[in-house]
Amino acid sequence: MNAVTDLKHDYLVADIKLADWGRKEIAIAETEMPGLMAIRDEFAASQPLKGARIAGSLHMTIQTAVLIETLKALGADVRWASCNIFSTQDHAAAAIAASGTPVFAFKGESLKEYWDFTHRIFEWADGGTPNMILDDGGDATLLLHLGAKAEQDASVIAKPGSEEETFLFAAIKEKLAKDATFYSRNLDAIKGVTEETTTGVHRLYQMAQRGELRFPAINVNDSVTKSKFDNLYGCRESLVDGIKRATDVMIAGKVAVVAGYGDVGKGSAQALRALSAQVWVTEIDPICALQAAMEGYRVVTMDYAAEHGDIFVTCTGNYHVITHDHMAKMKDQAIVCNIGHFDNEIDIASVEQYQWEEIKPQVDHVIFPDGKKIIILAKGRLVNLGCATGHPSYVMSSSFANQTIAQIELWTEAQKGSSKYPVGVYTLPKHLDEKVARLQLKKLNAQLTVLTDKQAAYIGVSKEGPYKADHYRY
C-alpha cells in the first residue's frame, strides 16, 4: 500500500480521490441508520458535545463515517484511526478526510503503521490534547495507560511477549524519546472513554479491578441494543459474507466449527446453519453449551473437532482457542477464521514458521511440512471486516446511537463537575436502551402496543418504561 499523507492536511489515507465514492455510500448508509440520524437531529441545535475533543479508535468504515459526522454535528472535534489493520474501507476514510476530519487509516496497515496512527489521534494540531476517547477493543485506552507507566518505569516495555507488543513497545519508546510526558499529559486530560466491544470491555474491567483505570468508562457493548443486535444479528449477516468473498466455498454440507456460543457465536452458528452447514460448537460455559445443544448443535471439544471440521470460526475473545496442534490435525484446505477481536484467538504465531502463500489479499495458504495446506483468512484478524465490509448499516445504527449517547453522557456530566461518574466502568441506563430501540423500530414500520393505566399498575412499571428490571436477561 502506497498510502499518501498530504503535508498541507492533517490526514493519512490510501487515496483521497476515493472521497466522492465514499460520500455516495455514506449518503446511502444514512438512510439505513435511523437511530443514529434521529439522535443527530435531536441534539444538533443544543450542541451537547461542544468542547469535546474525541480521539476515536474504531473500524474506519462507511458506517463509522456516519458516526463521526454525527459527533461533529453535535459539536465535537474529532481525530480518528482504525482499530484493526485490515478493517478500513479506503473510500470511507477518504470521504472523512476530505470533509476536514483528521483520519489516519488504510486497509492493510503494518503493525508499525497501526501504532503510529493510534498515536496520531492524540496529537492535536494546536498542540493540545483530546479530552475524550471513543474506543473499540481498548487499544487507545491501553496506549495511554501503558505509556504513562513507561514514563515512570521503562521495564514495563522492555520484554515484548508477542509481535504486537514488539511494535507497541517500540512505538512508545520512540514517542518517549521525543516527549517524556506525552502519555501522562494526555491521560490527565481525558474525561472518559466509551468502549464498543467485548474485548475492550474485558480490558476495562480488569484495569478497574487492579486499580489502574484513570478515568470513567461507559461499557457500550453491554447495552442490550448493542450486544443483542450488533453482536448477534450483525455477525449473522457479515460472517458468511466474509467467508464467501474470501473463498467462494460451498457451505452446505460442510462441518462448521464455531468456537464460543455467546452472542457472536450464536449469530455465527445461525448463519452457517441457514446455509445448511453441519454446525458444531465448542464451549467452556455449561450454560452456553446447554443453549447450543438445545438449539440442535453438536457440542464438542476443539481437540475432537480439529480433524473433522471444514470451516473453523473463533468467537470467544479468548487466547489460543485454536492452537498449533489443532491446525496440524486439520484437513487439507480447512478454512480457519476469527470473528472475535484480536488475532491471538488463533495461534497464528505458531504457524509463521511455515511457508505462507498469498492467494489474494487477506487470504493465505499455510503450507505444513507434510504438504498439507490450510486457508487462513485475514491473518487471524476479523474476517467480516478483513474479507468483507463488516456489519450492515442498520444494525450499526443501534451500536453507534449508544456510542453517541454515552459520549454525551460522560462529557456533559464532566462539564457540570458532576460526581455521577467517578473512576469505574458503567453501563447506560435502561431507558436509554429502550430509546435506541424505539428509534430503530420506526424504520421497520413496527407498531408498539401501549399499556393501559391498569396494565402498567398491574405489572408495576411506568407506561413510558423502562419495562424490564436491570437484571432481566433478554
Swiss-Prot record:
> Which residues are listed for substrate binding in this entry?
T61, D136, E196, K226, D230
| GO MF annotation list | adenosylhomocysteinase activity
Q: Pfam families attached here?
A: AdoHcyase, AdoHcyase_NAD
How the cofactor is bound: the record states: Binds 1 NAD(+) per subunit.
Q: Does the keyword Isomerase apply?
A: no
| Broad enzyme group | hydrolase
Gene3D superfamilies hit by this protein: Adenosylhomocysteinase-like, NAD(P)-binding Rossmann-like Domain
Q: In which pathway does it act?
A: Amino-acid biosynthesis; L-homocysteine biosynthesis; L-homocysteine from S-adenosyl-L-homocysteine: step 1/1
Query: Localized where?
Result: Cytoplasm
Annotated residues that bind NAD(+) are located at 197-199, 231, 260-265, 283, 318, 339-341, 384
Residue ranges of coiled coil: none
Q: List the disulfide bonds.
A: none
Task: Report the family membership.
Answer: Belongs to the adenosylhomocysteinase family.
Write down what this protein is called.
Adenosylhomocysteinase
Its ancestry begins with: Bacteria, Pseudomonadati, Pseudomonadota, Betaproteobacteria, Burkholderiales
Gene coding for it = ahcY
